[in-house]
Amino acid sequence: MPGFNYGGKGDGTGWSSERGSGPEPGGGSHGNSGGHDRGDSSNVGNESVTVMKPGDSYNTPWGKVIINAAGQPTMNGTVMTADNSSMVPYGRGFTRVLNSLVNNPVSPAGQNGGKSPVQTAVENYLMVQSGNLPPGYWLSNGKVMTEVREERTSGGGGKNGNERTWTVKVPREVPQLTASYNEGMRIRQEAADRARAEANARALAEEEARAIASGKSKAEFDAGKRVEAAQAAINTAQLNVNNLSGAVSAANQVITQKQAEMTPLKNELAAANQRVQETLKFINDPIRSRIHFNMRSGLIRAQHNVDTKQNEINAAVANRDALNSQLSQANNILQNARNEKSAADAALSAATAQRLQAEAALRAAAEAAEKARQRQAEEAERQRQAMEVAEKAKDERELLEKTSELIAGMGDKIGEHLGDKYKAIAKDIADNIKNFQGKTIRSFDDAMASLNKITANPAMKINKADRDALVNAWKHVDAQDMANKLGNLSKAFKVADVVMKVEKVREKSIEGYETGNWGPLMLEVESWVLSGIASSVALGIFSATLGAYALSLGVPAIAVGIAGILLAAVVGALIDDKFADALNNEIIRPAH
């Protein structure tokens, strides 16, 4: 990216201004623009520029100018061209600014299409650096040329002389534009080289990534590339050997042919020599000596032919020997390439074996890790299940203990009406509930057999007033409220589940009081167990529901006593048959 100096004092701001050292700039023919007697150089070579390299930058009031990798000026990420930007005065010089940011573009300044000489020089510099030559410039032997006007003078001098002056156009190099052109070529070549190197690197990286993605290791990929290079070297060396072998064969054929051509020449030489020997006797004969000299000339020609042919043979042999030497070198190169190929193959095999070994080790490690993970998972699951069992057991114990307390409390309250023996039976039932964990409730048939002992007792006949009072008490039970209260007994069940169970117990209890059929109530408890609820939990929920109902009763004492006996009978029937007998023998008959 160019800077410039038009000869002013300069403000030292780099490319956008100038670092001048000359006198103040002048106008017309004054200043450093040249004398009137040596012509107009069209502002060529008079303004100096400073080359900025890719990556250089400077600040202007309109934004930061950055030279990109291609040597182009950019502002706000946009490459500035003659179409989208203008030369704007800045300091004591000019700088290029995007048109969209310029409020007042540079006004015309004389010649050059309204542009100042400095502005024109900078734009020419930019254009040439981009590889384009402005009108009036051309390239000659790597130099940027243009035409300049020069004055020529002829004739005599003095006051009365006939001196004549005229102007001619002559070609002249513009060194600064030549440097700009070469700099642009260098920048573009470097950019092309970088792009090519980056493309090759990307291609190699993509190939390597594909190879690794297919399962190859980095070492295996590198070894494979080495094998490819070695094979290419073998192919080249083999082609060279083949060519040289053909050349040696051709040289041997030439030698054979020339040796064959030598035979008649030697025969001719021998014949010529024979003729010379035969004419030696004429050498002193003035008349016939001419014959000898003619034969002698033929001998010389024959010897020359033999020598020439021998030289050709020697040259052919030397050529063959040279080719053999080259062939030997080529064979050595070929052998070296084959050795390299063997080494590369070995390296590839080793890398492949190493990869396979590593993969096997990885698989073994993965399998071991998976087995360890499975063992850990199994152990964690065992621990979780054990904790869950322990937690359930804890919840069940908590439920049974609190239910036991509830039943004991119910026994104390109802015992106020039925006496201490009822309290003792209720306490026995409460203790059985407390220790019921791990046990199972009695079957429906067995439980009903025990319960029927109570309901069949004539003394357990319930009059209508008491029945209505007990049924009405059940009808006023709020299942949600009771479930919320029972929910505090244990985490063994959810309140939502208890609501449904309380509702079922309420419905079946009402049915029992109204019809005297307590089978549906007993079947309800059995259905809980069949659905997966532990017997202890089922007994706890059932007993707690009935106990909470009994504790909430505000009915006459006789009705409370009936409810207490039926509660003990129903709950006790699920635990042991003895409670039915105790109720019949110790509570019901004495009470009625």
Curated annotation (Swiss-Prot):
The record gives the membrane topology as:
Multi-pass membrane protein
- Tell me the segments the record calls region Disordered: 1-57, 373-395
Q: Which InterPro entries match?
A: Channel_colicin_C, Channel_colicin_C_sf, ColA_N
Question: What coarse category fits the chief subcellular location reported for this protein?
Answer: membrane
In this chain, composition skew of type Gly residues spans 1-13, 23-34
Enumerate the UniProt keywords alphabetically: Antibiotic, Antimicrobial, Bacteriocin, Cell membrane, Membrane, Plasmid, Transmembrane, Transmembrane helix
Alphabetical list of Pfam families matching this protein: ColA_N, Colicin
Give a short account of what the protein does.
This colicin is a channel-forming colicin. This class of transmembrane toxins depolarize the cytoplasmic membrane, leading to dissipation of cellular energy. Colicins are polypeptide toxins produced by and active against E.coli and closely related bacteria.
Source organism per entry reads Citrobacter freundii
Which compartment or compartments is the protein found in?
Answer: Cell membrane
| Name used for this protein in its record | Colicin-A
Taxonomy of origin reads:
Bacteria, Pseudomonadati, Pseudomonadota, Gammaproteobacteria, Enterobacterales
